[in-house]
Regions:
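Conserved, mostly hydrophobic/aromatic
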Residues: 35, 45, 146, 206, ...
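N-terminal catalytic cores of NTP/NDP-binding nucleotidyl/phosphoryl-transfer enzymes
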Residues: 7, 11-30
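Conserved, well-ordered alpha-helix/loop/beta-strand core segments that scaffold catalytic motifs
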Residues: 188, 192-221
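Short amphipathic alpha-helices and their capping/turn segments at secondary-structure boundaries
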Residues: 29-37, 202-208, 277
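Short, solvent-exposed turn/loop segments enriched in Gly/Ser/Thr/Pro and often Arg
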Residues: 44-54, 217-223
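Catalytic domains of carbohydrate-active enzymes, especially glycoside hydrolases
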Residues: 26-51
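Hydrophobic faces of well-ordered beta-strands that scaffold small-molecule active sites
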Residues: 6-10, 43-44, 213-215
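Alpha-amylase-like alpha-glycosidases and glucanotransferases acting on alpha-linked glucans and related
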Residues: 1-2, 11, 17, 55-196, ...
Length: 277
């Protein structure tokens, strides 16, 4: 039987930070210490997946990849990958009560590119990265390729990419983009390494202090996602990977007209054939 316990719901993005959005940095560790001091047991957070248009963690480009907005620059500086001057004068937004997602989307990219460049130039760090790549190959390669190709087409949704062979994952098209976008693909891999390194270290710290993390995950994946791109047979889609039906909920106390989420419905018979793997 569980003992009676309490906790706090506080998503990472809501932590105080100088970078326009909460991160896995010192304020997160301070919050863990606060939970310990106030005799809490649980820290509840929202999904940590990468966000798409609308900046909702429930509409993600991937069911697995992490949100790189949460990568802390000070921690990268401690690794020798950045200098404070790389980000100290950057305007990440000046409203302490709200995140300017569009601003940080563009402001963070060149800083992360600098960190990735310095990381790849440091041979002493590559063994751990290679280990990360090997352990996450089931999703990491596809995600990095998806994001790089998506960026190549102006960040358009999967279904609107100009090259329909890329949408359909034609082998010759994929090989072409792997060569053309090799640098960008590597960028998306390394930033995922940064994310999971920082998140794992924070979670381990919390657990060692007796704080348990209550996570969350979306019910569905987004139509514009790597899963729809790589596993279309698992969803109810047309030949262009557009959803035939979309998820939502009927009217309730939160919405008099109901909600239409736009996520593709699962093809449950195909999931059953694959053992729900």
């Amino acid at each position: 039987m569980l003992t009676r316990s309490s906790g706090v719901l506080m998503h990472i993005t809501s932590l105080p930070n100088a970078f326009g959005i909460g991160s896995f940095g010192q304020s997160a560790y301070d919050f863990v210490d606060f939970l310990v001091e106030t005799k809490q047991t649980y820290w509840q957070i929202l999904p940590l997946t990468t966000t798409s248009y609308g900046d909702s963690p429930y509409q993600s480009f991937s069911a697995v990849a992490g949100n790189t907005h949460l990568i802390d620059f000070d921690l990268l500086t401690q690794m020798g990958l950045l200098k404070e001057s790389d980000y100290a004068s950057v305007n990440f937004g000046d409203d302490p009560t709200s995140v300017d997602y569009e601003r940080i989307f563009f402001a963070r990219r060149p800083i992360l590119e600098t960190a990735v460049k310095n990381f790849l130039a440091n041979q002493s760090l590559q063994d751990d990265f290679n280990h990360f790549e090997k352990n996450n190959r089931l999703w990491l390669d596809d995600f990095a390729e998806f994001m790089a190709i998506k960026e190549h087409f102006g960040n358009q949704a999967l279904q609107k990419w100009d090259d329909k062979k890329a949408v359909a994952r034609d082998p010759s098209a994929l090989e072409k983009y792997r060569i053309l976008l090799a640098e960008q693909i590597q960028y998306f891999k390394v930033t995922q390494y940064f994310f999971f390194k920082q998140w794992t270290e924070l979670k381990n710290y919390a657990n060692q202090k007796g704080i348990q993390i209550i996570g969350d995950m979306p019910i569905y994946v987004a139509a514009d996602s790597v899963e729809v791109w790589t596993k279309p047979e698992l969803f109810q889609l047309d030949k262009e990977r557009n959803p035939l039906f979309v998820a939502g909920v009927p009217a309730d106390q939160f919405s008099a007209t109901g909600q239409l989420w736009g996520n593709p419905l699962y093809a449950w018979e195909e999931h059953k054939k694959q053992g729900y793997a």
